[in-house]
Design a protein with these regions (language model features):
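Conserved alpha/beta core of the MobA/IspD/sugar-nucleotide pyrophosphorylase nucleotidyltransferase superfamily
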Residues: 130, 137-258
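Residue-level signal for inorganic ion chemistry
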Residues: 65, 79, 110, 175, ...
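Conserved N-terminal catalytic core of the sugar/cofactor nucleotidyltransferase
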Residues: 1-75, 82-83, 87, 96
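Hydrophobic packing residues within well-ordered alpha-helices of enzyme cores
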Residues: 18-22, 90, 182, 239
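Short, surface-exposed amphipathic charged segments that create phosphate/polyanion-binding patches used
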Residues: 44-55, 119-124, 234-238
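Conserved core of the sugar-phosphate nucleotidyltransferase
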Residues: 30, 84-172
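A short acidic, often aromatic-flanked loop/helix-cap motif at beta-alpha or helix-coil junctions
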Residues: 39-44, 112-114, 143-145, 227-228
Length: 258
């Protein structure tokens, strides 16, 4: 779908099992790199606070990959199903950048295509201007479909959300200049969150700041695809059924990595 290189961001402790079960199969089709996100992967001058066990978050995960990535790249959650068309769309945009920097992108999904039948979900609701660029993302943490439609159970009561509200599922496209911005943002995060052993540094927070500062623009690419993931264990049967349906339809082979 447009990509031939992949960098897996993992922990050292799972490397052997990961390479044997996933990496070995992927290496037949991609140039594969392994990058390690560990607590002590910190900028110079910082140390891991005593008692910290929680990973530093998605922005930190991307930052540790800086030595493995030297061209425009896409970022995904490893446990989400985005659909092949989303990858083709973002790959086409990245190929068209022709060395430009500060021109990022993301693939937005219709909110109605990202819900769970088994409980509330957290989604980054996107604001988009007339030019098609992102102006900001706001995390809504209690979204579900009700008899009255889709609502977010916020602190100030239920807020209705339109079916076609664009939301981020963490499918972003960046150019390598992102890493310098990412490190600066992460340094500020470490200083501001000192003493908070559970604070995390997220990609959407970083992107929002770059937009607000005028440092970068983020083009919003639209996907009509159905997103799949397992927010609740009860979501898995539906995910499996839909994957089997796509295999029967010839969209995917039964054995993807053979």
């Amino acid at each position: 779908a447009g990509f031939r290189r992949v960098a897996f961001i993992i922990k050292h402790e799972i490397e052997k099992t990961f390479r044997e079960t996933i990496g070995a199969r992927m290496e037949k089709f991609f140039h594969v790199a392994y990058v390690y996100q560990e607590l002590d992967c910190l900028p110079e001058g910082f140390t891991v606070p005593e008692g910290r066990v929680k990973p530093w978050g998605t922005n930190h995960a991307i930052l540790v990959a800086r030595d493995a990535v030297h061209e425009p790249f896409a970022v995904i959650n490893a446990d989400d199903f985005y659909g092949a068309e989303a990858f083709r769309t973002i790959a086409e945009y990245l190929r068209g950048l022709d060395g430009a920097s500060g021109r990022y992108c993301m693939v937005a999904y219709k909110l109605s295509r990202t819900l769970s039948e088994n409980g509330t979900v957290s989604r980054g609701v996107c604001s988009v201007n007339a030019a098609g660029d992102l102006t900001g993302m706001v995390e809504h943490t209690q979204i579900e479909r009700t008899a009255a439609g889709i609502v977010d159970h916020g602190a100030n009561g239920d807020e209705p959300l339109a079916e076609d509200t664009p939301v981020s599922m963490n499918l972003f496209g960046f150019t390598p200049d992102y890493f310098a911005h990412s490190e600066a943002f992460f340094r500020s995060f470490l200083q501001e969150s000192a003493g908070n052993l559970k604070a995390e540094c997220y990609i959407p927070s970083m992107v929002n700041k770059l937009i607000a500062d005028g440092t970068a623009s983020v083009r919003v690419l639209r996907s009509p695809a159905q997103w799949f993931g397992v927010t609740y264990k009860e979501d898995k049967p539906l995910l499996v059924a839909n994957l089997k349906k796509m295999i029967r339809a010839g969209i995917y082979p039964e054995y993807l990595w053979r």
